[in-house]
């Protein structure tokens, strides 16, 4: 037994001598010696200087590294585990030499750049405090250190991880670790001396570090990137005493932590989107409008598009108020079903308005959309008024046809705005909507006066004729898009109004003896009003014709055409009424 113990002790002495010789060689070249791992109870401070080019190092001062290791003396397994590190010391020295040469080239390159920018000296100090674990000196890759050390607590892996973190932040080993001994030589020459303290942190300190990183958003250029090591629990933290210096330090030392800032911004945007979803739960209609508003802001980003969004929402709210009024006035179930159809029509109109704003994105087109919304409101008011006056089922069916016609007109208006996108076409669209409103007023009056089924069929044919005329108007605007054609379209719409007024007047002058007393009273009461409105419309039509820049012959042709068409309609109407009265 004694011989075995002596043999083991002799082997240990031989290994210690070899490690001491290799440590001296590594120390002369500027490396961390591996023989210090045999003394876990010591507290060592080593200074190593690496000089590759004397011209740069003498002018700037040799950069040195100061490491302070606090090692526990209670670890009894370090002597046995240090033998495993000593066996791999030969491989470590070759890799550390390559690593030192690369880092020293970076130091020389940065010093050349600072000769022109920063003539004064800058020294930095790294103090590494380590409590517990093994003491091992050697710059080895962390993945290889995991394979060699099962405990994963080697100082070499910790030092390499610290070095990786410093390189990510734009620092090389020598730039981030200037010696504190050079501090006394410069006597005021160091303007920015940073102290970077690396130590093993607890969970509470990690949480505090995360909060500090969020607070330092304004000074994000000085935030050090925090990453977990492969085989250690080290984390980089700024010293509290020098934190105010780091906030106003140079920009080339600590770079921006882009990943953390982007993550925080994404969280902020997610919170805003969640708030938008909460608003959408409160009001479904407003949430749909706000979602389309977000798409417009992301796609176009123009100020004019965003200004026109609340106009559309205000028009939709006004439509809802009009619906409430019309439903209070009407009590017939068949008319309530017609209101349901109107609601579907207007919802389709609002969705198409959003599509127009997304596709076009121009200010003129949006103004035309707001005008169209106002015309739809006026149409609904008119429908509510004459539904209270009319109680005949056949006329209710005719109202359904009118609703289909108006919806077709609105869809064609959407196509014109999407394809054309010109200001002149939008003005003609708003005029067309006004003409449709006037036509509906005239239809409402004529239906109150007339109760004959044959005349109801005639109204149906007139409606088909007007819808066909509007479709041809759409084709002309899409093909030509000129200003003169649009003025002619407005003239044709006014001429249709005039024809219907003449027709209504002839019906009032030749009443049917078979009509009810209720319809007769309405005819007498409304005859004066319809005549007055007829005169107003005719005077308005004449004024619009005088304002046009066309020739006088063109106006004369239009008037003659309308007079001839009025006479023809009067003859047809008299022929239809004579066999019924006899």
Curated annotation (Swiss-Prot):
Location in or out of the cell: Secreted
Keyword set, alphabetical order: Repeat, Secreted, Signal
Ranges annotated as biased composition (Basic residues): 111-134
UniProt key word Secreted: yes
Composition bias type Polar residues, residue spans: 137-157, 174-192, 325-335, 427-437, 445-455, 487-498, 506-529, 547-557
BP GO annotations: coagulation; negative regulation of flagellated sperm motility; sperm capacitation
Disulfide-bonded cysteines: none
Ranges where the record places region Disordered: 25-65, 91-157, 171-192, 272-366, 393-557
Pfam families, alphabetized: Semenogelin (PF05474)
InterPro entries linked: Semenogelin (IPR008836)
One GO CC annotation: extracellular exosome
Domain of life: Eukaryota
Biased composition (Basic and acidic residues): 50-59, 293-310, 336-345, 353-366, 396-405, 413-426, 456-465, 530-546
Signal peptide start and end residues: 1-23
Function: Participates in the formation of a gel matrix (sperm coagulum) entrapping the accessory gland secretions and ejaculated spermatozoa.
Alphabetized PANTHER family for the sequence: SEMENOGELIN-2, SEMENOGELIN/SEMINAL VESICLE SECRETORY PROTEIN
Subunit structure and binding partners: Interacts with SERPINA5.
Recorded family membership: Belongs to the semenogelin family.
Protein name in UniProt: Semenogelin-2
Organism name: Colobus guereza (Mantled guereza)
